[in-house]
Amino acid sequence: MSLVDSDSDEEEDATSAQPYVNLMKRLIETNPQKAKRRKLDHAPAEDNQPEAAPAPESGDEDERDDEQEEQRDVDEVEEAEEDTADIQPEDLFDEDDDLDETDPFETHISNPDENTVPPRVRAAQNGKWKMQRQPFESTRAYWSYPQTEDGQELPLPAPITSVSNLHLKKRLKEVMEFKRSTFGVVEKTVAPFLFNYRDMLYCDRTVGSSQDLRNLAALHALNHLYKTRDRVIKNNARLAKADANEDLELRDQGFTRPKVLMLLPTRQSCVKMVDSILSVCQPDQQENRKRFEDGYIEKLSKFSDDKPEDFRDLFSGNDDDMFRLGMKFTRKSVKYFSQFYNSDIIFASPLGLRMAIGSEEERKVDFDFLSSIELVIVDQADALLMQNWEHVEFIFEHLNIQPKDAHGCDFSRVRSWYLDDQAKYFRQTVVFSAFNTPELAELMRAHCHNWAGKVRLQQECPGTIQYLPVKARQTFSRFDAPTVAADPDARFNYFTKAIVPLLTKRNAKDANSTLIFIPSYLDFVRVRNFFANNPIVEAVTFGTISEYADIPEASRARSHFLTGRHKVLLYTERAHHFRRYQIKGVKRVIMYSLPDNPLFYREIAGGYLQKSEQSLMVEHGQGVVRVMFSKYDLMKLERIVGTSRVGKMIKEQGDTFDFV
């Protein structure tokens, strides 16, 4: 039964059938596709390079090309597509599970209510959403759901405090009750939305909570896969036993096999997620495990303890951001490097998956394997923002598009909402991030259409300025920008008129040892060119450190800044993210814009000035921080000054705010 209005009107019936008719026409016209070879055998185009990737540190270009080719071969897979009907009864994960009509898998995926769900889908299609702000557990919940014409509310899910509250497959419940029967604060906050198939943006991920979040994501993904697989196997048995004249309509599948997509920043983060999955499924056999260890695991520690905890958590191990990995599950084994169309879970970095999809220019485009994704997990989204976010957007734009080829699909078994081109309204998207940003908010707005609703979970911010390791005079100056598009020009004009004169006036000894922190690379280029070419600042010597500076270049800039040869140092947020330089000699910090990551404010505005005090380069409490902001910096500003202050700073008539 299709999830559309059950009107008897012929015109509406024809309209509702149109997606299925179009799909079948397209598949008939398309030639059968041969077995695919999943290999990245084309060099990345310049546009596909991560915007913030640091330049190679050493080695000539030929050596780098060889290394890149070798790295690409790590994930190469040569394997034919399997017959989706070739699943044996002995592959059942659990033989004695009883059907529970209250199970979220049933109510959301397998057997959605034909009376209540279609109006929600229609409201989501029309962009009619209602948002409510409610306290939930230990955080704030911004809850949105499709608003139907009858105005019926969609309440928040019931609390979940332990494994016993979950509808888990028997074998998973047994493992979890032994490992962790009760939940902590983070798990109690996340679990109700995760296991009830709500879209979720969780904005309080920390190093300390990361393992709990991974474990929950792994458990939910496996539970979804096991239930999907067992339903198919049991229905196969029913069809095999059915009489020839018995009309059984058993719709239990999508177009292609992959059901879960996990977007992760590095190979090491992939290793951590895989380990969480293995700790729950506990397979007897692991096919291609040695190959996985060789290509993904680095056991030697690369960083000393003086690097911040979040930096070591992200970049320790194999920090390559170019990978994609298919994983296939059977009752007793897992297989690494399975062909995408034979995989249950796809692990990938945004860049790796973008390259696997291909490009129109090369006429090698394939994203059919994303057509039936029902669960997307985006972990460490704040780290992905420091890569090329356009790759993430590209991937979401290609999710749940009806396939160009059949791939051996039995259309009599495909769920109705797939045939009706409604899959994106049933897909669950879960994003874990250390903080919220406009990019993440837009991702939730533009690509999360779940009929069951979506939530943003975010704690109130006390403000990073309270935790600086040194006393400093901090001045926040607000400038006006009429629109978001006009913000860059307004910011630059304010900088040249209000900030630059402080560096150029004749007795401006304070200009020495000034670090200018610039989050955006485009803004960095603009300011760099201004210092290089404008006669107003010709007397101000300056150096630069961006994400593209190699190690020797950055070392020279730091040295010249420390000795005073360069009065000003321009420093980008991505350079700090990827390197976490300990820059010495800073007496004044000017923030062209606030960092997205509030930890960076503490490290730069506090940590750099603290080092200068300890080396007696600046007197105690005499360090200066000057911050430029507009109303469009609301999210960043809240994390720095705190939730209780941000409203006044954005709305009050005064435009200067001092903190000590």
From Swiss-Prot:
Bias class Acidic residues marks the residues at: 1-14, 58-104
Q: What is this protein called?
A: U3 small nucleolar RNA-associated protein 25
Gene that this polypeptide is encoded by: UTP25
Q: Determine if Cell cycle is one of this entry's keywords.
A: no
Q: Which Pfam families match?
A: Utp25_C, UTP25_NTPase-like
List the subcellular locations.
Nucleus, Nucleolus
Q: Which residues does the annotated region (Disordered) include?
A: 1-133
User: Which terms in the Gene Ontology molecular function aspect does this entry carry?
Assistant: rRNA binding; U3 snoRNA binding
Major localisation: nucleus
